[in-house]
Amino acid sequence: ERKITLEDLWKDYVFSPKSITGFKSMNDGEHYSTIEKTDNHQQIIKYKFINGQKVRTIFNSKDFDIPKINEYEFSQNEKKILFKTEREKIYRYSSKSIYYIYNVFTDKIKKLSDKKVMHATFSHDAEKIAYVQNNNLYIKDLRSQVTKQITNDGEKNKIINGASDWVYEEEFGLVRAFEWSPDGKHIAYYKFNETHVKEFSMDIFRGGLYPSQEVFKYPKAGEENSIVKVYVYNIEEDKHQYIYTEKDYEYYPRIKWTNNADLLVLYGMNRHQNELDFIIANVAANTNSILFTEKDKYYIDIHDNLTFLPENNFIWTSEKNGWNHIYIKDLEGNEIQVTDGKWEVTKLHGINSDEMNIYYTSTEDGSTNRSLFIQNLETDEKKKLNNKIGYNTTSFSKGLKFYMNSYSDANSAPIYTLHKNDGTLLKILEDNSDFRLKMKEFNLSEKELFTIKTEHTEMNAWMIKPPDFDKNKEYPLFMFLYGGPGSQQVKNSFGWTNFYWYQMLAQKGYIIACVDNRGTGGKGAEYKKMTYKELGKYETIDQIEAAKYFGNLNYIDKNR
């Protein structure tokens, strides 16, 4: 049996199962597209949901002289595709790239700009693209090929238009800081004034003999943040409208247009992040009002589970009863709670209005698992759509008629399948059987999931023992942890390359373990948020308790 080497892991990528890349539902809800690599070329291929059969190749890079495609995005009418290439990372999520626009009907391709830009996004009619360059917002008209700069005050470490500052990207997950209105006549955008934010410098190694120094605005706890304002730009009138709010908020973590092109939603938040106002701004009337306020004794997690429905209702998720659940609200402030229980909704997929069915993923099978459910809004009847306990990650078609599911568990690589919306299996797209067969060459140990009880709490944990484990021997212990707010390291899901690094250590005679301390996710708001204002205290207590637990096991050398 083969032993795992570092070269296997990080040089030859032996432990990389197949996946479905670039999966996107197409507008008709009957087809989907993926991006696939063959003979060093990339193709975007259209398939049928009903049977997974190929319909046609939409794009083949061998016909064009363009770099490797990092991402692709259809325009709303699917007549054009935007390609992101030569991606250059900035912070955790942000990047700048060379973009190309491909016309599906003329089979022609054009570069958006000769320079790298950020956040290129089609207008809803696909006739314009907005993007950010050098902290300013631009619009390119694809008919006339004229590019217009719509902000002029952008300057590094001073003013940012249309892209987020470090805090919003890292702490709120907001990267693109502008939104096209549904009718394409307006762009709502953020303006960050970080002039008074203190600077941080960091050495960056780019392959040369000496590093270069990156100086950027980085507010530490208690220091001054960027001053943030939201504007709406009227394209026809070439005017910028400041969205005034009654309160002076520290943060605006999200903006989103409703289905009505005059109504823009803003989240307004205080510095402690424990009070959120849901604000509706009427751009045409230049008025706004607070629809509802949410408060929390700890803090409020920002999410993207806001979905507007045709009836002027919207779906919202909240942890206000201690667990993340689904609510339907209307613009008068009325609400109906849809889900309830001591478990969390981890993803909202949407509502099929015709059948009154809502689809969501939750922890109802335990905090380390993810399962897909359908619930009828009229009868409250609920059904689980996956039949295996483990980690299910689901992507639905437009209109929610079909879905693709990825299933894995702690010891199994993902299986990708197509289904009807009632759970009926249509096709296995990839079962990674070749990968599973190859793994039999290696002497692998099982990753065991269990819980550890202490006098303070109960924690999820996993352990990997050496392949030739002998309970009468003592083994050194390697504990891996992260344990940051809302994170989860202990999941009943495939661990990708890190899983095999742990297996390599196990083959060398180590026991590897991981414990999710208080402050981590999947177990309700109280468990996750109790570290508020005391970050590091309970996490340390719990990891020490876990280490003591392991040290008392007969087969672990407590000195190692």
Regions found by a protein language model. Give the residues of each.
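A short helix->beta-strand "capping" segment at the edge of beta-propeller domains
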Residues: R2-K18, E237-Y244
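Predominantly five- to eight-bladed beta-propeller fold
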Residues: L6, G52-V55, E86-Y91, S95-I98, ...
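Conserved beta-propeller blade repeats
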Residues: F15-I35, D63-I81, Y99, D114-V132, ...
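Beta-propeller domains
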Residues: T34-K62
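Structural motif
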Residues: N40-K46, Y91-I98, N134-Y138, V197-M202, ...
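Short loop/turn segments that connect beta-strands within beta-propeller blades
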Residues: F49-G52, N103-D107, L142-Q145, N234-D238, ...
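Beta-propeller fold detector
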Residues: K54-N60, K110-S113, T147-E155, Q241-Y244, ...
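Serine-hydrolase catalytic core recognition
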Residues: E199, A261, Y267, T393-R560
